[in-house]
Amino acid sequence: MKEGWIGDDYLVLFDEAEVAQVTARYQVATQLPGLNVIGLRGWDDLIVRDAVGSAHVVPSVPMDPQNMTPYVVPGHAALKQDSRFAGKIKWYLQPVVFGGDPNAGPNVAWVTHEQHGELVAWWNAKYRELKVNGGAA
């Protein structure tokens, strides 16, 4: 895994050997079958790759294919390391789609990569549940 800044975006780019494990952690097959997680952009978006190698970004919550946009993945060498954020991911305790405040403050916590995967999977399951039951999400 390599992480760092490129312009205004903080990126986490996973090594090829990590892709299957990370994809499973985020339970991407449930929401985006056939795609693999290859990175994170700005802590809020997953960078995914399709079977032909094209990359896209999609919000981590909700992980909806309608919200995917094409993305050109920069090379690892372009990333400017920043030890303040190494191994941490900014997480909204109540995701914005559920009415959480997007500004820094009491709604923001810093979590590990493993915790982030668990939180993304849990909140996406909650989103699907509400959507199926006609709730507002």
What are the residue ranges of the model-derived segments?
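Nuclease and nuclease-like effector domains acting on nucleic acids or nucleotide cofactors
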Residues: 1-89, 94-137
